[in-house]
Amino acid sequence: MELKLLNANGQEGAAVNASDVVFGRDYNEALIHQIVVAYQANARSGNRAQKDREQVKHTTKKPWRQKGTGRARAGMSSSPLWRGGGRIFPNSPEENFSHKVNKKMHRAGLCSIFSQLAREGRIAVVDELTLEAPKTKLLAEKFKAMGLDSVLVITDTVDENLYLASRNLAHVAVVEPRYADPLSLIYFKKVLITKAAVAQIEELLS
């Protein structure tokens, strides 16, 4: 698989040969869906909580007598049928949202995503991406010259200036190959990879 190489001005140069094992796989939508759902589920903090009828603070006194009022019988105001009462099946912080995905499946899913992005022309390669100073304006000018507005930058080592400059840009993220996740790869319109990072990705996923 050949990936297009961009210079600092956004002009295309000679193509970069990439491994077909990583960038030339068939599109497997079911597998991609599985690893994205697992990634989102495992990222949940699991801190939502609601109260059942034992936990809400209500009196246990019977609201009115059982018979003779003409109203429906009621035992206590903490009943789930009442406004302000407890939930019948409340959410708990003890719930387990984790999804298990085998390493082999995870690698295959990432390869499928990279391959589809390459076919759609959403991957571009640069020799390197560095900044002289941690200035957002400098990085924004670089991306503008390349025609990039929503971009995931995958670099072999995250330069401190590059990281600091990217923090204030919307729809821009800078990561190392080992931290490239399936959701980010799908979310951003373009993926910009340094030459050294391409080799690292091939080593990680082959």
UniProtKB/Swiss-Prot annotation:
Residues 58-70 have a biased composition (Basic residues). Residues 44-85 are annotated as: Disordered. InterPro entries: Ribosomal_uL4, Ribosomal_uL4-like, Ribosomal_uL4_dom_sf. Part of the 50S ribosomal subunit. Belongs to the universal ribosomal protein uL4 family. One of the primary rRNA binding proteins, this protein initially binds near the 5'-end of the 23S rRNA. It is important during the early stages of 50S assembly. It makes multiple contacts with different domains of the 23S rRNA in the assembled 50S subunit and ribosome. Forms part of the polypeptide exit tunnel. This is Large ribosomal subunit protein uL4. The gene is rplD.
